[in-house]
UniProtKB/Swiss-Prot annotation:
Protein name per UniProt: Ribulose-phosphate 3-epimerase
Gene Ontology BP terms: carbohydrate metabolic process; pentose catabolic process; pentose-phosphate shunt, non-oxidative branch
Reaction equation(s) it catalyzes: D-ribulose 5-phosphate = D-xylulose 5-phosphate
Cofactor entry: a divalent metal cation
Pfam families: Ribul_P_3_epim
Record NCBIfam families: PRK05581.1-4 (NF004076), rpe (TIGR01163)
Active site positions, chain numbering: D34 (proton acceptor), D172 (proton donor)
EC numbers on record: 5.1.3.1
Function: Catalyzes the reversible epimerization of D-ribulose 5-phosphate to D-xylulose 5-phosphate.
Species classification: Archaea, Methanobacteriati, Methanobacteriota, Methanomada group, Methanococci
Cofactor note: Binds 1 divalent metal cation per subunit.
Organism the protein comes from: Methanocaldococcus jannaschii (strain ATCC 43067 / DSM 2661 / JAL-1 / JCM 10045 / NBRC 100440)
Record-stated family: Belongs to the ribulose-phosphate 3-epimerase family.
Annotated pathway: Carbohydrate degradation
Length: 234
């Protein structure tokens, strides 16, 4: 089952309570909160207070995405969060960060920028809950999905399966009804969308269309693999 996370980067912060409620009623599975420091990425976004406020406004899980240089300074601020995502490019001691996240009761997710090779996470792949594949350059909402990232997602899926891990694949960046099927066919388990949800007049319909597009791709992929498997047996 494909899960959908609503990134509040595109939400109306002047009416955040209402935005959260609309997304909940639309059927999103969790909320994704980006935190940018203006150093790791050029933009500055939500601070610690906003992430904590979102957590108070919903019963759904909340993931905080740390797009910051000094991950160590921020992890302990988010002990009430369900998932904490850090960038492999920002840390020297990833196992230490992973263990710290686990120690406060959250699930660790490691993120990779588009140009970062999968080799960078090879040795921590079995220790994280998920890998978040950035399909745009991090820092700004509304960017276009980078098509070649589907190759990266497929390779990551193969690494996970070959090693017998249960690690999930999150995909974040440029996700909409056109690109969601591409990510799902490549192996994504979770889709994070911002403007494709909060940028729409009818949030409920937007989430419905996004989920249907993802599930249709998943079902087609399953049927194709089943057909090919039967052909090989004959």
């Amino acid at each position: 089952m494909i899960k959908i996370g609503a990134s509040i980067l595109s939400a109306d912060f002047g009416h955040l309570r209402e935005e959260i409620k609309k997304a909940e009623e639309a059927g999103v599975d969790f909320f994704h909160v980006d935190m940018m420091d203006g150093h790791f990425v050029p933009n500055i976004s939500m601070g610690i207070g906003i992430a904590k406020h979102v957590k108070k406004l919903t019963e759904l899980p909340v993931e905080v995405h740390l797009m910051v240089e000094n991950v160590d300074l921020f992890v302990n601020e988010f002990e009430e969060m369900d998932y904490i995502t850090f960038h492999i490019e920002a840390v020297k001691f990833p196992f230490r960060i992973i263990n710290r996240i686990k120690s406060i009761g959250a699930k660790p997710i490691v993120a990779l920028n588009p140009a970062t090779p999968l080799d960078a996470i090879e040795y921590i792949l079995g220790d994280v809950y998920a890998v978040l594949v950035m399909t745009v350059e991090p820092g700004f909402s509304g960017q276009k999905f980078i098509p070649v990232m589907t190759k990266k997602i497929r390779k990551l899926k193969s690494m996970i399966v070959e090693n017998g891990y249960d690690t999930k694949i999150f995909v974040d960046g440029g996700i909409n009804v056109e690109t969601a099927p591409l990510a799902v066919k490549a192996g994504a388990d979770v889709l994070v969308a911002a403007s494709a949800i909060f940028g729409k007049d009818d949030v409920k319909t937007a989430v419905k269309n996004l989920r249907e597009a993802a599930l249709e791709a998943l079902n087609k992929d399953f049927l194709t693999k089943s057909f090919n498997s039967n052909e090989e047996k004959q």
